[in-house]
């Protein structure tokens, strides 16, 4: 530990600084040697105490060097840390890189299992594959569009009625036979506002209903004769109020 007091009254001269540093260095080099474990330097430097000079006063400067560390024979110092030889061997073994020669090649069964796992990673149900459900409808004849296989095929809504009748002629009178009748709807009426048309058309295309008939209804309150205006629109219905 070096303790000193530096006081500055004005700008020092070069000769004053060089003389002070030279005497300080000579004192330290004279009293300190590599073999010494402790040294005490007590010196006082008194320079010109005029207001235009630089004054250095080092009072009771104590310099203590720590004892040299004794290194055992089996330990080699590397920087600030010490590592034993056994530890070095362990580190070398841990840093061995796995080369392709050390890796066991996969069997055909393992490769096939990895491929199946990669294919089925997008689905939780075994055997199903998720595909893109939405495709372009620019030219449906050129590009066939289908729903994903895990969803049911959507068509026009229908009603199913299940009948249970007796089988006749038959020996066993308790015999029954079941059949069902399906009534498919040919028309699907969807009522939508103007801001809902795009959403309704999207779902119609998604359910593979590529044909649609639009019916425009105009409701207005006026005293003017609108027959000529509405007559230009084919298939429109006139509601007069």
Swiss-Prot record:
Pfam families, A to Z: Ribosomal_S10
Keywords from the named record: Mitochondrion, Ribonucleoprotein, Ribosomal protein, Transit peptide
A molecular-function term among this protein's GO annotations: structural constituent of ribosome
SMART domains for the chain: Ribosomal_S10
BP terms from Gene Ontology: translation
GO CC terms, sorted: mitochondrial small ribosomal subunit; mitochondrion
InterPro entries: Ribosomal_uS10, Ribosomal_uS10_dom, Ribosomal_uS10_dom_sf
Assembly: Component of the mitochondrial ribosome small subunit.
Protein name, entry field: Small ribosomal subunit protein uS10m
Source organism: Arabidopsis thaliana
